[in-house]
Regions:
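Alpha-helical transmembrane segments in inner-membrane proteins
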Residues: 1-315
Length: 315
């Protein structure tokens, strides 16, 4: 069985390398005199955005599904992106409380994601029904969206434009100078998760068996919550809210691997998540290299039917 899992991870790695090559050397060729500048300042950061956002959101979804013990959990569905978006909006529109004004965009988005995750975790402990939890997540997203709309009605045109562009989700927003920051956050979170594989596997068994195995469940859940908020918040800050990746990819990984071993789940989820967003961005480049089609449009086209299928399958 482990050999089968290893083969899937290897194939995902091969696909990852092929998409990187396709993205850099086939779809984004330039013939001008500034090839070197364009490559390092625009093409590489765009590719890194796809890789890091896909990997981070997928891993965030996997952690949330473990934490909530619910395969329908995800950073977008349960409102983490909405929490991050709200604090980002407060910061951009200049109406944030004083302590939030002291934060960077990344810090504000991370705080919003953490507060949203904490709220949904408390709700999940009281609401055992999957459909009810999803409805509450959607209500929270609608509530934060309504607050943003009210704030925008009093904002300057430039502020509204900045916020709308960011909310559409894009892999072109991150600059070359910002790339090391997001890379460090995502890679560090992946490393910590790989270190916690045994504890994550124990949490799958339930709270009591995990305690009997010597796992400090409360501390572990707090750590998972922090990692989830860090991943979802930082990616939302740099790329805007991106839907369905964190929900669909972990479920796809479980369906393919047919295991709860988080060593293979983490590796496969991270690779497939990166490949998914690289493929989405490649499709945008094929349609029109200069088109600013929001990433959320294509992730919704692919992700929404799969999520609907998952919900019907659970009924």
């Amino acid at each position: 069985m482990k050999q089968r899992h290893t083969i899937f991870v290897i194939w995902a790695s091969v696909l990852f390398c092929m998409l990187c090559w396709l993205h850099l050397f086939v779809l984004q060729q330039n013939n001008g005199s500034h090839d070197h500048l364009v490559f390092w300042e625009f093409q590489v950061p765009r590719l890194l955005s796809a890789i890091l956002a896909g990997a981070g959101l997928s891993l965030s979804g996997l952690l949330m599904q473990n934490l909530f013990e619910n395969p329908m959990a995800g950073p977008y569905v349960l409102g983490l992106n909405s929490g991050a978006s709200l604090l980002m909006a407060l910061l951009v529109l200049g109406v944030a409380p004083a302590f939030i004004n002291e934060l960077s965009y990344v810090g504000a988005a991370m705080l919003g994601a953490y507060l949203a995750a904490s709220l949904m975790f408390v709700v999940a402990r009281r609401v055992q029904n999957v459909q009810s939890l999803l409805i509450i997540g959607l209500m929270f997203a609608s509530f934060t969206g309504a607050i943003e709309s009210v704030l925008q009605s009093y904002a300057a045109p430039e502020q509204i434009k900045q916020l709308l562009i960011w909310n559409m989700g894009s892999l072109q927003q991150m600059s070359a100078a910002q790339a090391p920051i997001l890379s460090g956050i995502v890679l560090a979170c992946i490393g910590v998760c790989l270190f916690l594989v045994k504890s994550l596997n124990a949490l799958v068994l339930g709270e009591l068996p995990a305690l009997q195995l010597g796992i400090q469940v409360k501390k572990m859940r707090f750590l998972v919550l922090m990692l989830t908020a860090l991943l979802a918040g930082s990616i939302t800050a740099f790329c805007g809210p991106i839907a369905f990746v964190g929900l669909a990819i972990p479920n796809l990984a479980r369906a393919v691997l047919k295991t709860q071993d988080h060593l293979y789940l983490i590796l496969f989820t991270v690779l497939v998540g990166s490949c998914f967003l690289m493929a989405i961005d490649a499709l945008i480049l094929v349609l029109d290299p200069w088109m600013t089609l929001p990433v959320n449009v294509l992730t919704a086209v692919v992700g929404a039917p799969y999520v609907a299928y998952l919900m019907m399958k659970k009924r």
